[in-house]
Amino acid sequence: MPYPEIMIRPFREDLTRIGVEELRTPEAVDDAVKNTSGTLMIVVNSVCGCAAGKARPGIALALGNEIKPDRVTTVFAGADIEATDRARSYFTGYGPSSPSIGILKDGELVYMMERYQIEGRGPEQIANELTQAFDKFCAPATMAAV
């Protein structure tokens, strides 16, 4: 049974208010993966404390980086169950984990941050790792070669 929307709305808004696009159906996830040229970040959001105190603030900090994914999206584990399952199907080689953050480049997974990598870190550490991933995988080819 999904979490009540009234309970999770503030957790969704932590990301949507900073411009992260929600994907609420499997079709929306497939569309994002298939129709995003370049890099796509998918955040698996959740109700847990490490999502609230670490992952979401870390993502907000990281999105202030000059280089970032072409498109940033989110699914909500425990609420948008089918969309979350579909997003996780693109995280090849990784088990279900929430919160988690995957970066796909032209539909292929190139970076993954799982829950265990979030739990023991603060928002600044998470942001630092994400910005390193952005710099590596999201920079235009001309910048990446410099």
Locate predicted features.
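Thiol-based oxidoreductase modules, predominantly thioredoxin-like and allied folds used
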Residues: L23, V44, I67-R86
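Short acidic (Asp/Glu) patches
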Residues: T84-S98
